[in-house]
Amino acid sequence: YEGTTGIQALDLLGRKVLLGTRGKCVRDFSRIMLRSAKAHWLAHGSIGRMARSTAKRAIEWNLVTLRIMRRVGKDRDLVGSASVDYLMYSGYVMMAHFWVRQAAVAQTFLRNGKGAESAEFYRAKIQTAEFYFDRLLPRADAHRKSALAPTRSLMQMGNGDFAFS
């Protein structure tokens, strides 16, 4: 990636997560995620499943961050190679948190009938959250794996290897 995505990714991982807070920003937000998920993880059905998945992702996000922090001192290419995948991974994980919160509120309004919107709106909100967890959130796994991949394959080509006669 080049341009905006690459720059924002380098800023997130390099400046904000690693240098600025030594991972504290991730620990703080994932603590919020866990607290929110805990309120629903024993629920039956999709809300409980989504809450448990969110809790797992919050813990995993901390582990991914810690693994990068431990390797970065020995591998100067790691921040550049991991940053875009780390950005994408973080985005998917954070959105899981917001989707499960929205779905839980929608379920409450469906049950008590006190929401300002129609029942169809709240059902659609829950269905959209289910779609996110089933179809989009699994993409985070590939980004996690790529962010943690060795940099050797990325950096092994020399400058001369890019010139063909």
Please give the residue ranges for each predicted region.
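Catalytic phosphate/nucleotide-handling subdomain of diverse soluble enzymes
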Residues: 1-20, 24-25
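Generic recognition of well-ordered alpha-helical segments
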Residues: 9-13, 32, 95
